[in-house]
Amino acid sequence: MPLSDIANVSISLQTGGLTQQGFGTGLILGYSMTGWTERSRTYSSITGVAADFATTTPEYKAANAYFSQTPRPEQLVIGRGTLKPTMIFKLTVASVNNSQKYSVVLAGTQFDVTSDGTATNDEIIVLLQAAVAAAATTAGFTAAIGGVAPNTFLTLTGNAVGNWMSFYPTDPALLTLQQTTANPGIATDLDAIVVENNDWYALMTLYNSSACVLAAAAWAESKDKIYGVQVIDSECATVAAGIATDISKALQTAAYFRTWDTYHPDNGQFIDAATFGRLLPYIPGSETWRGKTLAGISAMGTVPPFKMTETWRQNLIAKNAGYYYTNAGRNITAEGKVAAGEWIDTIRGRDRLKARIQEAVALVVMNSDKVPYTDAGIGKLDNAIRGCLRLSVGDGFLTDAYTVVVPTAASQALVDKAARILRGYSFTAP
């Protein structure tokens, strides 16, 4: 029986059943495991992950980013997805320039081509396809030219479901990247995983196209989870919020309160996993998610390969998306908001407080022969709830200026008394 059957708690946000350890635990939805019959495994270090995954797999790379932070998280869950995606990248020319160098990085190797003195879109695409074709094949992908002249584009498609590689242009002002991977059934896999193991809090995915991200975000929104995702589509940064149709804008438009997206052009960085690894060890609500340095993550700056202009930065801010950049000589995370605009530490603190109140009220009910429907009985519940509020003040999530409204037994409707339901108890925290 869930605790919500005993204590149904609703905490609303007035601005803009996990264990304590579970609130500090992330889950990576993976596909590279072999020989598993279970839907998840829990790890306490990268050594354990290395026993199950090759160092070339995205699961290992994401886990390594997660466990490399200080303070280090205590544990990580990797969930087994059975509905594997086919990874697809689409690369288009954003600016056709004569005698211009165009560069992409595939599986860690940079490939450069230079247009001639009478450059065309199609010429640049042909040069890029020829440059990366062999390396793409080695990585398990096919580099092909799509579209119709004079507006062709380059696609890189996994030769088998579950194939993964890193790929990005060094300058989104010249080349625009988009992941177009179809959603293979992310919600179905996650539903199966939580049946076996629901004691985790922060979801991470490895194939982050718009379709996959929106599916994962919708799933997390309906659960007591948060979803952190690194978005790499160039238009998240390069297109203004007012006219954008990219992933970050779609998440913002959907007003997701449980999804935090951060932009970095290189999907091999795993900035989402690194950020979760850095901040999940803190008591929920006691931390801020901006201004933090991440171990092993390359920051964006004014020049390639991880270029960030002030205009692009403002575009991301307008979409409530995060980013990782160099500021005053220090590499730090920026913004720390969920897609709907609330601070992610507020969401996390609220979730923990809700869970603790449910536990506290349930314990009063379960440890008492009977909680009488009198003012004295209501007082027992009030004392338990106030204890949770005081803990949240000590954690730094709430201020001590909160107010509590405690209903009297006489104010309750007879039908609620008969059903043993208490209505009207509430608290407000500035």
Residue ranges and their predicted role:
Residues 89-91, 152-158, 332-335:
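Generic recognition of long tandem-repeat/solenoid scaffolds
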Residues 122-125, 129, 187-190, 213, ...:
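Extracytoplasmic/secreted envelope proteins and their assembly/folding machinery
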Residues 2-11, 172, 195, 249-381:
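Extended basic-aromatic, gly/pro-enriched interface segments that bind polyanionic ligands
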Residues 45-51, 95-169, 221:
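Extended, beta-strand-rich, solvent-exposed assembly scaffolds of outer structural proteins
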Residues 65-83, 161-294:
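Extracellular Cys-Trp
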Residues 34-100, 134-137:
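Assembly/oligomerization scaffold segments
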Residues 1-55, 70, 74, 328-430:
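Structured, hydrophobic secondary-structure cores that serve as assembly/anchoring elements
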Residues 56-58, 162, 245, 374:
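Serine-centered coil/turn micro-motif
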